[in-house]
Amino acid sequence: FTAIDIHHPNTFRLITDNHVDGVVVLGRCDKQTLSFLKKYFNCVAYTGLNLLEAKYDQVICDGYQASLAAMNTLIGLGHTRIGFIGETQFEDRYTGYCAALSAHNLRPAKSYIVNVPLSSEGGYKGAKELLSRKTDVSAVFCCNDNTAIGAMRAIKEAGLAIPDDLSVISIDDIDTAQYLSPMLTTIHIPVEEMGQMTAKILIDRIEEGHKVPIKINLPFYLANRESSPPRSEKTPAAEHEQTISRKEE
């Protein structure tokens, strides 16, 4: 179950009534969630993008480093005004966004940052909010692909072209990413391997195969596609205006 599900009465009833030997938690965990886990369960394994400061078995793909990679990709392509769409509290991807800007002596403007749930709906609303602020962003970093999908729809509905007017990059590399138009540039997270490794570690813990907490950090890579190409020196609109001027001369 996810960190969101854990406090639901039905979830608690399900795992206690069935005498669960161990649990796997997906996603972010706050202190309240950790206290709950410590109280009721001996064998706990966590998998996600945010490293936990706790003595539990963990299989992660470092969301902080993945965000740095995504941001460094955009900055390397010439973007200096980069928007953020996603969650900002207890979120390593937001921390990575800010750290990447700081490393390049760029300030994360508040108007560039939109705090929304990580979902297609959240991305859609987040992009509409960002665009309504009339910022001068040239690229947007979305916390995950579902958020990016919603954001891309809102950007297109606003009459903007991706990537000519606005580049988009995200994290996950779900199957849908390569079938979008344009195809989504994203950081590939080895979700299947993370799940398999977490299950193996939890079973080993239940069978008393190990007692010391294990932390495994799996690698990611950039799936470089169409939504984030090198930035042109001139925008299509500017080039169009120059063409008209030459014709008038």
Please report, for each region that a protein language model flagged, where it lies by residue:
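Bacterial carbohydrate/catabolite-sensing allosteric modules
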Residues: T2-A3, P9-G22, L34, K38-Y46, ...
